[in-house]
Amino acid sequence: MHETPEDMERLQALLDRSIERAGAFLRSSFEMPERSLSAGQLVRYLQGNQTVAFATVTAKGEPRVAPIGSLFFRGRFYIPTVATAARTRMITARPAVSLTHFAGIDLAIIVHGNATTIPADHADFASLEAMQRAASGSSVQDWGEGVYLRVEADTLVTFARYPEQFPA
């Protein structure tokens, strides 16, 4: 785990705010907060590379979604990619994104927010590269002009059918 105590507090506050702002139907269907994960449970679960459905928006306002690997570092999702990828260009112009990680009908992690590009000269880049290499054996720099997309979540909701199976 790379999260500081401040990261954990920020993440738990985001989770709590997201539950408070959720509509009645979502709170009911996700059985919030009883079946929600805590910051500690989420961080422990999201170790390594996790596949997410990552959604961006085209210049025409059309949604684009694709499965892609992600890293969870200091309480935020990061998407390894290259600067020339269509998703990177879309985010530069229109930073609103959504992502979802799920495991059948027993687990869902849903994020809405904005993404920014993290280039090689960013302070977090070396740590992200080490995580990426450990998780997948490759580096975004192996792909060309590698970058990471950092998702700053406005909303982060979780559902775990069996939350007790997720240690904190």
Report residues per predicted region.
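Charged, gly/pro-rich active-site loop segments
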Residues: 1-34, 105-168
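Structured helix-beta-strand junction loops
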Residues: 21, 48-49, 93-94
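Short secondary-structure boundary/capping segments
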Residues: 43-44, 69, 89, 139-141
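Short, basic/aromatic recognition patches
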Residues: 24-52
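Short beta-strand segments
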Residues: 49-83, 89, 97-101, 110-111
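Amphipathic alpha-helical interface surfaces
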Residues: 42, 87-90, 124-128
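Short, intrinsically disordered, mixed-charge
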Residues: 92-97, 130-133
